[in-house]
């Protein structure tokens, strides 16, 4: 599930957004009282920023349906990458197969093998974990189309209507050293324990919100530790090199606090498609392999320049927003609930308002 803005640019438009959401309502988990209600209309945008949930399965199916049959090869884990001369990359799969390619885009998530190949270190654990869940209401859930966020008591959680019948929720928490030793392992392995743990962390929350968590089926929850890439690595690292580049979580694993990880991956797919289409244009078909390779490398370098600062910005903002929204203690509670509430939501929404252009290449 991701929060995103629906773009109406480009030749084809797919409307995958669920219910358009009108505002973000923040509530203190300490007091149970609302601290801000920010409408999306108040966020400066280019006029086509619609916020809503996109169901991951629907997005993947829509993208896959656009490709010729047989383009996607499933269950093909990349285990090693080697340069073959200056032009080709040899990709070794777990089942022993070798593939040869001129371009390799590593979008293999937070444990990216391609990021290893480009010299990035493994993303760091941020000391927080996240649980996600989904609840279906046969007769409708009755919630307004708003994002409901709760902060304080060392947790940060939210409930988001996807449509009239589905609610998505998340909760992030910092395992205490004790929980780390005993309960944390148990939590990931035992959904009953996980649910009890979540219910114990909600704080002062109106009953109708608590009921969402109580109603969640055990198999509809997933829990995972949160990891991110240090921003300085993104400043200095090789986002692209010798026809290989990174996109999505492989490039910028970030905490989920501004809901932009998957949105940024989509931005990258648009920019990459545009740049590579330009580099591989058919009217260059008589060029030598070396010339073509140089064009590919130039296009990936241009892509890397476009994404470097955006990635640094998103990873850093997400981290800072998470620290402020999840921390506790009297001073932090006061600052977050009385002074920063609107600012933090505004920062989140501003990051979503990004124009990555259209798929059509500019005439150059
Ligand atoms: C609690 C939580 C809430 C979130 N909320 C939002 C939100 O509201 N909005 C938003 O935009 N983002 C959100 N995100 C982030 C979002 O889920 C990720 O940024 C997004 O899924 C990244 O997509 P990706 O394709 O880069 O990586 P993934 O989704 O991780 O996909 C990677 C793919 O690569 C494959 N793969 C892995 N290793 C290999 C290998 N060696 N060889 C071949 N294939 C491989 C995997 O099987 C997988 O299919 C949230 C994340 C969390 C944890």
Regions from the language model: what does each represent?
Residues 18, 23-32, 211, 258, ...:
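C-terminal helical "tail/cap" subdomain of flavin- and related membrane-associated enzymes
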Residues 9, 58, 62, 113, ...:
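Alpha-helical elements of Rossmann-like donor-binding domains used by nucleotide-donor carbohydrate transfer enzymes
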Residues 50, 54, 60-219:
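Conserved FAD-binding catalytic core of PHBH/FMO-like flavoproteins
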Residues 106, 131, 220-320:
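Conserved mid-domain beta->alpha element of the FAD-binding
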Residues 3, 38, 76, 85, ...:
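Short, flexible helix/strand-to-coil boundary loops that buttress conserved ligand/catalytic motifs
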């Amino acid at each position: 599930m991701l929060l995103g803005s629906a773009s109406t640019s480009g030749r084809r438009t797919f409307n995958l957004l669920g219910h358009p959401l009108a505002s973000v309502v923040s509530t203190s988990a300490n007091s149970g009282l609302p601290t801000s209600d920010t409408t999306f209309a108040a966020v400066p945008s280019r006029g086509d920023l619609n916020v809503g949930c996109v169901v991951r399965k629907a997005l993947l199916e829509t993208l896959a349906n656009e490709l010729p049959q047989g383009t996607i090869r499933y269950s093909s884990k990349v285990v090693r990458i080697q340069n073959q001369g200056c032009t080709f990359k040899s990709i070794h799969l777990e089942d022993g197969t070798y593939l040869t390619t001129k371009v390799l885009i590593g979008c293999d998530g937070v444990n990216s093998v391609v990021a290893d190949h480009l010299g990035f270190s493994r993303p760091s654990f941020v000391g927080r974990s996240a649980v996600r869940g989904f609840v279906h209401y046969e007769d409708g859930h009755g919630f307004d189309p708003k994002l409901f966020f709760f902060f304080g008591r060392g947790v940060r959680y939210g409930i988001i209507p996807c449509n009239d019948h589905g609610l998505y929720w998340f909760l992030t928490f910092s395992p205490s050293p004790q929980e780390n030793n005993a309960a944390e392992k148990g939590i990931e392995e035992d959904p009953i324990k996980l649910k009890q743990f979540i219910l114990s962390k909600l704080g002062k929350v109106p009953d109708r919100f608590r009921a969402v968590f109580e109603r969640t089926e055990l198999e509809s929850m997933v829990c995972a530790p949160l990891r991110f890439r240090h921003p300085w690595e993104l400043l200095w690292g090789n986002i692209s090199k010798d026809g290989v580049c990174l996109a999505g979580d492989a490039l910028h694993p970030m905490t989920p606090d501004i809901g932009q990880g998957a949105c940024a991956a989509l931005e990258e797919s648009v920019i990459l498609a545009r740049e590579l289409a330009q580099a591989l244009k058919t009217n260059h078909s008589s060029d030598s392999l070396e010339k073509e390779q140089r064009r590919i490398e130039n296009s990936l370098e241009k892509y890397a320049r476009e994404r470097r600062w955006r990635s640094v910005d998103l990873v850093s903002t997400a981290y800072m927003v998470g620290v402020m929204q999840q921390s506790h203690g009297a001073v932090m509670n006061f600052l977050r609930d009385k002074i920063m509430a609107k600012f933090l939501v505004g920062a989140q929404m501003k990051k979503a308002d990004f124009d990555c252009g259209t798929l059509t290449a500019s005439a150059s």
